[in-house]
Amino acid sequence: MEFATNRVTVNDSRSALSSTLLLSLIMSATLLEYSLSMT
């Protein structure tokens, strides 16, 4: 039982981390595009 709840917590933190990474990737890509269009 304890193992199952631990696995769920790991899954939640992993999905949160991946969504944060995806968001930062999109933001940096947008910033890169913006700075390229400025020049």
From Swiss-Prot:
Keyword Membrane: yes
Subcellular location: Cell inner membrane
Membrane topology summary: Single-pass membrane protein
Transmembrane segments: 15-37
Domain of life (superkingdom): Bacteria
Cysteine disulfide links: none
Keywords per UniProt: Cell inner membrane, Cell membrane, Membrane, Transmembrane, Transmembrane helix
Principal location class: membrane
Gene Ontology CC: plasma membrane
Protein purpose: Required for microcin H47 production. Possibly involved in a regulatory loop modulating its own expression and that of MchI and MchB.
Protein name (record): Protein MchX
Origin species: Escherichia coli
Lineage: Bacteria, Pseudomonadati, Pseudomonadota, Gammaproteobacteria, Enterobacterales
Gene that this sequence comes from: mchX
